[in-house]
Amino acid sequence: INGCLAPLLIGTAVGTFFTGSEFMVNKNAVADIGAPVISRWANNWHGLEAVTNPFNVEFGLMVMFLAICLGSLYMINNIDDDKLATQLRKSLLICFAGFLVMLLLVLINFITMEGFAVDTEGKVFMEKGKYFYNLIQMPAVLIMFLLGAVLLVTGVVMTLMKKEFRRGIWFAAPGTVLAVMAIFMIAGYN
């Protein structure tokens, strides 16, 4: 259960980078050396309210399916057992399909969801399509995301299509790193 639940919850938490979390920051406590904390949860759920947001859950499921895919690719590469490799390829196919569905939902949300933006006068406002605009305003990050996606898909598809091919992790892992870095950059830009 830990192998599925942990990536699901971590992905859900990362989804809050885009949707926000319910906590309050006490700016007066920042300069107070004796203050043990500067932020507190705004409710008694302590962040678990994130699972009530569909985008966060979609993001979490995407991360979970990706983790299972990468684990399958790693084991196919490192364990010399044809019977196990056949079972792992079946798991890889199912989980990659789940990953693609969740990725599509997340990308649709990226194009349409609102995000915090700052106008020329320094005023913060909610901008529709903010993360999509962030992506197209940073062509290097867009290229990084697309290259990562191509590497990931290449690793998975080659492993699924060629029974003798076992090195899909060597494409998928660097692709995952590039795509995830791009997603964090999209969240952090202005």
Report the location of each language-model feature.
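Long, contiguous internal "core" modules enriched in hydrophobic/ aromatic residues
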Residues: 2-165, 181
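C-terminal hydrophobic structural anchor segments
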Residues: 156-190
